[in-house]
C-alpha cells in the first residue's frame, strides 16, 4: 500500500484509570498495526509509558508539540503530549472527575483534528460514563456529546460490530417500558438507512440488512402486538423501495441464527431495543465487540467493553476488541466521503 493511501487516525487513551493505556500500548506495539495507518496519539506521555509497562511492551513514537500540521513522514506514530488541564493526578481503577475531564479534553482535540481534515477517523480507548458525568458532561452518553460538539443535527445512533456483523437499534438507552411508544415507521426506516450508509462507507457495496421484530414470535400476526404489522414491516418495505437490501421483520429469538456461519444471510441486523442485539453480540464474541458512533460526519470507533477497573493495571486486558476497532476506523477513514 502506498503511503498516501493510508488512513490518518487520531487516537486517545480513554479514561486513564481503566485499561485504555495498556490496550493502546499493546495495539501500537504491533508493527502490522503501525504500517496500516498514520497515527497521531493525543495522550499524557507518562500515562502512555505507564501503559507500556503494564502491557510489557513498547512502541516507537515521535513527539510533536503542535497539531496545526501533521508530518506523517513514515510509519512512526506521532505523540502530542497532553497533560490534564486541572493539573491533578489520575486516580487508579475508579471513576473520577479528573479522569472524565481528561477523556473529554483529549476527545475534543481528536474531534477538531478530524473535523478539520487533518485526520480521517478517531479511535478511542474505553470511557467511563460515571467519570464523564462527574466531569460535567450532561449528555446521556458520549454519542450525544460528539453530536453536539460537531454541531450535527441529523440522525445518529450507536452501532455494535462483531467481526463483519453490524447491529444497530431503533431505541437505545431508555426504559424497556418506553420502547413500544418510541417506535414509528420513520424511526425504523432511519435506523435501516443509517446502518446501510455506514456499511457502504466501510467499503461494502450492497449491505444485506435483517430487521428484528418487537414482540415474541413477531406478534403472531397481531395476536399479541401489532408493531410488526403496522410499523416495522411497512418501514422495511419502504427501505426496499429506496434500493436498500432490507428484509424482515424476523423474530428476535431466531434472527441471529441467520448471521452465523459461512452461509450468513445478513451483513447487519437492526433491532428495536438495546438488549435484543447486545445480548446476542456479547454471547457471540464479547472480547471482539466494537462500538461505532453511527451517522456522524466523521468515523469514530472504540472497543465495546468498558474501562474494566477490576483488572486495570494488571496486564490482563485483551486487546482483541481494540484491534477490531482500529481495523474498522481504518476502513471507514479510507472510504470517508
UniProtKB/Swiss-Prot annotation:
Its cofactor is Zn(2+); Mg(2+); Co(2+). Gene3D superfamilies: Isopropylmalate Dehydrogenase. Catalyzes the NAD(P)-dependent oxidation of 4-(phosphooxy)-L-threonine (HTP) into 2-amino-3-oxo-4-(phosphooxy)butyric acid which spontaneously decarboxylates to form 3-amino-2-oxopropyl phosphate (AHAP). It comes from the Bacteria. It is an enzyme of class 1 (oxidoreductase). One of its GO terms (cellular component) is cytoplasm. This is Putative 4-hydroxythreonine-4-phosphate dehydrogenase 2. Pathway: Cofactor biosynthesis; pyridoxine 5'-phosphate biosynthesis; pyridoxine 5'-phosphate from D-erythrose 4-phosphate: step 4/5. InterPro entries: PdxA_fam.
